[in-house]
Amino acid sequence: MTQNTQMHAATTIAIVDDDDSVRSALEGLVRSSGYKTRTYCSALDFLGANLKNEIHCLISDIQMPGMSGVEMLKQLVATGYHIPTIFITAYPAAAPPPGAYSPDLVACLSKPCDADKLLDSIEVALQQRH
């Protein structure tokens, strides 16, 4: 195992999306890059899991029923959690710029997102965490 692969294996990425197929595709991509993943079907599911301290990067849809990705990020910040976050959205015209709402917002990518852009954004997010 290379040092980079070992570092990735010790890193957990949370994926929050209400669309099963998107969540599954993102999980496959992130795992194929050597990261551990945890998936959630809603912002409320993620917040209720109480594993926020174990998450190194958060990938979240913006538009979800119950609570949006933006509302989830605001709640994380309000409760003292600072997880580098990447938003993905089917509505790029309404996407917030990096740093909006919180310096933890690293990127906002359009769906379907380019694999290389997402993986690059994860690397930026992980560097921000350290």
What are these regions (language model features)?
Residues M1-A14, D20-S21, E27, D114-H130:
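Non-catalytic signal-transmission and effector/linker regions of two-component phosphorelay proteins
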Residues I88-T89:
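Hydrophobic/aromatic residues positioned on beta-strands within the core alpha/beta folds
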Residues S60-D61:
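Active-site T/S-Asp motif of two-component receiver
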Residues N50-N53, Q75-H82, P103:
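Conserved phosphotransfer cores of two-component systems
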Residues M64:
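Receiver (REC) domain active-site loop signature in two-component systems and cognate sites
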Residues E71, P92-C108, D116, D120:
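Alpha4 helix (beta4-alpha4-beta5 surface) of REC/receiver domains from two-component response regulators
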Residues C41-S42, S68-E71:
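Acidic catalytic/metal-coordinating carboxylates
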Residues T39-C57:
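Acidic, metal-coordinating helix/loop segments flanking the phosphotransfer/catalytic sites
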